[in-house]
Amino acid sequence: TFPLQLGSKLCQGKSEHCSITLSLISRFTLMMFIPLVVANARITDFSHANYIPVLDGDVLVFEQRDLLKHSSNLSEYASMIDETQKLSESFPHSHMRKLLEVDTDHLRTLLSVLKVHHRIARSLDFLGTALKVVAGTPDATDLFKIKITEAQLVESNSRQIAINSETQKQINKLTDTINKVINARKGDLVDTPHLYEALLARNRMLSTEIQNLILTITLVKSNIINPTILDHADLKPLVEQDTPIVSLIEASKIRVLQSENSIHILIAYPRVKFSCKKVAVYPVSHQHTILRLDEDTLAECEHDTFAVTGCTDTTHFTFCERSRRETCVRSLHAGNAAQCHTQPSHLREINPVDDGVVIINEAAAHVSTDGSPETLIEGTYLVTFERTATINGSEFVNLRKTLSKQPGIVRSPLLNIVGHDPVLSIPLLHRMSNENLHSIQNLMDDVESEGSPRLWFVAGVVLNFGLIGSLALYLALRRRRASREIQRTIDTFNMTEDGHKLEGGVVNN
């Protein structure tokens, strides 16, 4: 566009021939530049940047989680079972009484599973999930026991939403029906058909509710939410959000609290506040030194950029929680003054970071992407490809067969290096080893340039033997000199005062 604007100004007031010539030149320029852009669209140079931003689709950012609460009072269930057992005696027909007794026994067995009692830990805990699914009994680690009353639980968080109100309403409605039938009896006669149907219906609802609780507690260990405990009428606050309920539930966290006869199931779902672009950030090595990036994921929103943590990928969306602290990487990409630390580079020269994404760090490489001609590059580059890429003879395959990640735009903030952290890593040790081997090789080259290595070896051997011989001769002469000194001292002690030597012999009388 700049050449066109400049040419139009030059051709103002000129003939039509000037405009035609300018148009031809512009077309030729575009024909020259378009192939160059296409050929290098998958290889982006980041050699002079401080970091590499990679766009990784959309992300939903939340600052807090709201709670869904499912509470169950086991003592109420037990009292309903006792009531059914007492009322079963009012039925004259034995088959009705027998069916109700079977129901009450089954409900008591299910209810005993949820009671707080000591459980012996399994030695083979990896069989726990399979055994629990078959038997329907959670083990000791499935229940997070805490002494907390229901009132304290409700007061602890004002954002809690009860989600089992509809089920409880239906159970209470059946209980009211049973009470009406009993109160409407005439003398000792009871409307047994209606009472029997109401008791059976309530037993079925109790059995379903208790089994749902058992399955929910069993799945909590894997952070899987049992959808049967959710009722659409209780999820209206979630429907108000633009995000589908299924995705919110996938990104939720669940915990079970039990106190005496009360079980509370808490589901913490994300309250989405922003819809942004997800940016993955990678460091760039300069002379084997990189910036220390404590957090490597950002959310590039319409008006601001946030550092995010705890990202969860669901079937349709990615959820991330906004980080509260100011980080180096956030300041870098937001274009603010960034206070950063550096550390020794631990990056490999050819580093595949995701499907269809490879980073070349301070290295020379022959690169070919998706069947394109081979290109020689040197420095730090981001290579993206849809199917395959060949780098220095090694082939990389994109298993997804689609290119969902694109290079982002690097900001140019004011970078302040406030410290260097000497972090030790395997790549650093490997690089130090290579440097040592290179130094040794240089030393050997210097020795070879001065003469034959065999000649230097012989000269060294002769010199060593000469030094050893000189040392041995010196020690021998020193030992002989010491012996002479000792002999001279002995001779001195053997002399008399008149200068004659003492000689041994026999004295004659």
From Swiss-Prot:
InterPro entries in the record: Gypsy (IPR009882)
What start-end ranges are recorded for coiled-coil regions in this protein? Answer: none
Where does the record say carbohydrate is attached?
Answer: 73, 392, 494
| Domain of life assignment | Eukaryota
Q: Which UniProt keywords apply?
A: Glycoprotein, Transposable element
Q: Which Pfam families does this UniProt record tie to the protein?
A: Gypsy
What is this protein called in UniProt?
Answer: Retrovirus-related Env polyprotein from transposon gypsy
Supply the source organism for this entry: Drosophila melanogaster (Fruit fly)
